[in-house]
Structure formats: structure tokens, C-alpha cells
Amino acid sequence: MEIIPPRLKEPLYALYELRLRQGLTASESRLPRHIAVLCDGNRRWARDAGYDDVSYGYRMGAAKIAEMLRWCQEAGIEMTTVYLLSTENLQRDPDELAALIEIITDVVEEICAPANRWSVRTVGDLELLGEEPACRLRGAVESTPGVAPFHVNVAVGYGGRREIVGAVRALLGKELANGATAEELVEAVTVEGIARNLYTSGQPDPDLVIRTSGEQRLSGFLLWQSAYSEMWFTETHWPAFRRVDFLRALRDYSMRHRRYGK
């Protein structure tokens, strides 16, 4: 038996959301500059809702992404990174994967729409997706302004270990091209040198990482960049993620004291 009657849920959530927003504003709460989001639980949401076709969950989750990005923009967040497709996801059933890639491509094109005026970057290896979706994604991203008040990273074909290995290889390749000796190559491998060759080069590390659907791990997401990020987990599946959940994450972040390993 439900404790709260269905007809009262929406008004109560609206009231709770208002109180959270007022609390963040009144206290001049410290907000994250960069939020990273693992949009997890699309398939589980579809199954729980009784759908045999899990692609419906992907479509509902896709509709949530632009909505969540607008919440970030309205809250004054400068940058958001969304994890849309990992390298591990590429091992899924071919038909399911094809539908997922098509949905993701549509989502990125929506995010890159001129009306949003967002600066968008892809992080990941687009070549893993195939020529047609990779071409569409590049075209969409290149159509966005290079500089804008709100920046979005879309992680597609992304793997954290793969990114770090690629950054080290790129760093050493540049040094070799400049005629570096073996000793100079060793000296060139520094924290700063690797960071300059990551997909997110030149960007701030995420202050807050949000993961939906109850899993409490990074699953390879921004392994290097999230070393000192605050984590926030919710049992809510991504398609059911609400603004009130987002505001709770901001509230909890504002109450934490970041130590950066000290």
C-alpha cells in the first residue's frame, strides 16, 4: 500500500523542489562548476515498466538528457559531462546496439541544436561506432560555438583506461617526433603531460559525479579526472530522474567539505 496517495505526489514533489531551490539560493550554497553524470538504468526502467523492447527505455532516457542539461544551465553550472556509451556497451547484442547508437546520435544532434547555444565536445573514440554515426556526431558538434557560457561533453565510445593509455601514447609520440632520448621520454611522463593529452584537455575536472540506478562505482568513467570528485548515488533509474533528485545532489554537494586527498 502506498503511503502517499498518487494525487498528492506531484504537488508534494513540487513543494519539495521549491524548498530545495530556495534553500540553495538563500544560503548562497557552493555549487559545482563541473558535473559528470552516468545515465544508468534505462534497460532496467523499461523492464520494470513492463516493456519487452528495452530500446523504449533508451528513448525515454534520451529525452531526459536535454532536460537535465537545462537544469544544470539554470542552476549556473558551467560544464556537464554525460556518459552515453562506453566501450563495454559496444559488446551488446548487435540489434540492441544499433538502436542505441541511433538514439544517441539523435540525442547529440538535439543537444547541438543552434537554439541551445551550448558548446559541445565529444569525448571518446567515435571510430568505434561506424562511419555514418561518427560523421553525424562530428558534424553536429562542429556546428556548436567554440566558446559559450555552458559547455557539454558527451562521452560516446568512451573507456577510462583506453583514454589514459591513449594519452600516454600521444605524449610519447610527440616527444619521439621531437627527437627525445629514452631518458627524456621517461621524464616527459608527468601528471601535467598526461592531462594535456586526455579527451578533456584544458577543462576542469568534475567536482561532482552523479550516478543513477543504484550502482556505486565509476565503471571506467573519467577515471583520471574524477580522482577527487565528490560522488552522489541514487536508486532512481535514469528515465525517472527528476529535478528534485538533481537539486538534492546539489544540496548534498554544498554540504560537503572537499579535502582533495589532504
From Swiss-Prot:
GO terms under cellular component: plasma membrane
Keyword Ribonucleoprotein among UniProt keywords: no
Binding site for Mg(2+): D40, E230
MF-aspect GO terms: ditrans,polycis-polyprenyl diphosphate synthase [(2E,6E)-farnesyl diphosphate specific] activity; magnesium ion binding; Z-farnesyl diphosphate synthase activity
Signal sequence, start to end: none
Pfam families from the UniProt entry: Prenyltransf
Enzyme Commission (EC) number: 2.5.1.68
Top-rank taxon, per record: Bacteria
Enzyme superclass (EC): transferase
GO process terms (BP): cell wall organization; peptidoglycan biosynthetic process; polyprenol biosynthetic process; regulation of cell shape
Pathway: Phospholipid metabolism; decaprenyl phosphate biosynthesis
Free-text cofactor note: Binds 2 magnesium ions per subunit.
PROSITE patterns per the UniProt record, alphabetical: UPP_SYNTHASE
Catalysed reactions, semicolon-separated: isopentenyl diphosphate + (2E)-geranyl diphosphate = (2Z,6E)-farnesyl diphosphate + diphosphate
NCBIfam families xrefs: PRK14828.1, uppS
PANTHER family: DEHYDRODOLICHYL DIPHOSPHATE SYNTHASE COMPLEX SUBUNIT DHDDS, DEHYDRODOLICHYL DIPHOSPHATE SYNTHASE FAMILY MEMBER
Function: Generates Z-farnesyl diphosphate (Z-FPP) from isopentenyl pyrophosphate (IPP). Z-FPP is the precursor of decaprenyl diphosphate, which has a central role in the biosynthesis of the mycobacterial cell wall.
HAMAP family in the cross-refs: ISPT (MF_01139)
Protein name, as recorded: Short-chain Z-isoprenyl diphosphate synthase
Taxonomic lineage from the root: Bacteria, Bacillati, Actinomycetota, Actinomycetes, Mycobacteriales
